[in-house]
């Protein structure tokens, strides 16, 4: 399964989401690929925000090797599921995707925990460190739900590519 986490700049929230979900998938023995992107290109090529890295490290994750990239319409062909971390990000994904947008494939991340509530993961960019811890806890909880939901498959090591049938590894 290929999952893309998307926030605004791809330096605070989505790098945490990528790191957390990739770690949880690995721990669960799932052969998932998790990546992240941002809807703007202001930080392309940059590593995650220092406070995102710090909070990840405090929780046993190293996200320092990640690099920001911009979300592109072709991501709809590359990923099985795309999670937006905020409503404005979801709107921008729709705009970028145009005719490739598939509502079955894209949702707000927090809808996994609170279906239909359309809650945002707040952007900690302007705040102090405690906001990054809050964001980490929110994302950690929803990633547990994602693992539980998608690993219920009787063959959890399957890989699914766009336009291909599930296959065993």
Q: Where are the regions that the model predicts?
A:
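Conserved active-site segments centered on acidic
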Residues: 1-78, 148-158, 166-169
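Phosphate-binding/catalytic loops
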Residues: 81, 87-163, 168-169
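Hydrophobic structural packing positions in well-ordered secondary structure
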Residues: 7, 56, 83-84, 139
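Helix N-cap/beta->alpha junction signal
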Residues: 14, 86-87
